Amino acid sequence: MSSVKRTPKQEIVTQFHCSAAEGDIAKLTGILSHSPSLLNETSENGWTALMYAARNGHPEIVQFLLEKGCDRSIVNKSRQTALDIAVFWGYKHIANLLATAKGGKKPWFLTNEVEECENYFSKTLLDRKSEKRNNSDWLLAKESHPATVFILFSNLNPLVTLGGNKESFQQPEVRLCQLNYTDIKDYLAQPEKITLIFLGVELEIKDKLFNYAGEVPREEEDGLVAWFALGIDPIAAEEFKQRHENCYFLHPPMPALLQLKEKEAGVVAQARSVLAWYSRYKFCPTCGNATKIEEGGYKRVCLKEDCPSLNGVHNTSYPRVDPVVIMQVIHPDGTKCLLGRQKRFPPGMFTCLAGFIEPGETIEDAVRREVEEESGVKVGHVQYVACQPWPMPSSLMIGCLALAVSTEIKVDKNEIEDAHWFTREQVLDVLTKGKQQAFFVPPSRAIAHQLIKHWIRINPNL
């Protein structure tokens, strides 16, 4: 700081800047309370109080000035912002405070590219062929086609049989029981007792269609193998199991559904979500009257002639999807992540924080709100990574990275049981050694696991 005689204004600016440079929060607060216009004042070299705090490594001063609304975009005579200064001098925590405040720049350690990935439950064997849902004649013909595949459900649990392989997560692999018309024709004869959903057609044309050339009229053969989900009641399900001892209904949903082959899991995710909607909305949500099923199981139509739901398009008439944000919260210095646990979790399991998006809320704001509600940690920059259908019963998990701008954890016991910052080394040990460690994370087929791995992969030298 120069010792040249200054004007009264220059003197107070100098004192303000000195208090920021020295980390004197009490003095800084006092000066600013009397002279709030000093917040963005610059010295002769173009430096602001924020720059001095960033240069000397005072995160509490930086946080205070940011909360007061100081301008982070000001550049000094060397064309540096406060963020540039913090990065140059190696103050990672401060650099991220400056970069991750809402509306700020992307944190310096995040990559610009996020590779698109397919998570478990998102792969499928089928083309949904939604244009066929209104073609009742086509659907009826496919129901009795000998090549058509039916997958059976009871209480939302799919009928499966054990497969012969094991995968890396050490769970026995199970496969869907793919039934044909002969297996289930008695159920189709009692439509009032079943739920039938058209799922789509196989993506690959199979030679087996040619085996039925004599059984199907030539004009009805289009080369498409249709799949349907068939929901039956528990009594019928028990009778079916007794006749097919090598099959069983997969239960409980978690973690049992994670044992399916990946493409079959995508089919189950679709079927289970629609069947869950069907079981929960048997009556019109608008007027309470009975409904009928149309569009291959994808629409409920009210039977009351003057019901408002019959005028226009209403989301109450179609299967619902519940958007959920799930986020890997990263410490401001980039070297730790925030994981939490709920009481219902297995002992020792920690995972990413998550929560439902509220009406009128963006993905980014939902991330910030949920993290603060559950852990007390404030979040700035949010970056989308990937999503995953989650049929429990019909959620869409929207996976994000979330950069914390505060570090103190204040757990809301009504939301979660516990939360901690975990170092990169701790998380790496868990991913490589599993449950041998003091804690563990969800299995690889859950998006939480993939978000954690994604964080580990970015800037591995941090």
Curated annotation (Swiss-Prot):
Zn(2+) binds at residues 284, 287, 302, 307. Pfam families: Ank_2, NUDIX, NUDIX-like, Zn_ribbon_NUD. This is NAD-capped RNA hydrolase NUDT12. It comes from Pongo abelii (Sumatran orangutan). Belongs to the Nudix hydrolase family. NudC subfamily. One of its GO terms (biological process) is NAD-cap decapping. Binds 3 Mg(2+) ions per subunit. Binds 1 zinc ion per subunit. A motif (Nudix box) lies at residues 355-376. SUPFAM superfamilies: Ankyrin repeat, Nudix. It catalyses: a 5'-end NAD(+)-phospho-ribonucleoside in mRNA + H2O = a 5'-end phospho-adenosine-phospho-ribonucleoside in mRNA + beta-nicotinamide D-ribonucleotide + 2 H(+); NAD(+) + H2O = beta-nicotinamide D-ribonucleotide + AMP + 2 H(+); NADH + H2O = reduced beta-nicotinamide D-ribonucleotide + AMP + 2 H(+); NADPH + H2O = reduced beta-nicotinamide D-ribonucleotide + adenosine 2',5'-bisphosphate + 2 H(+).
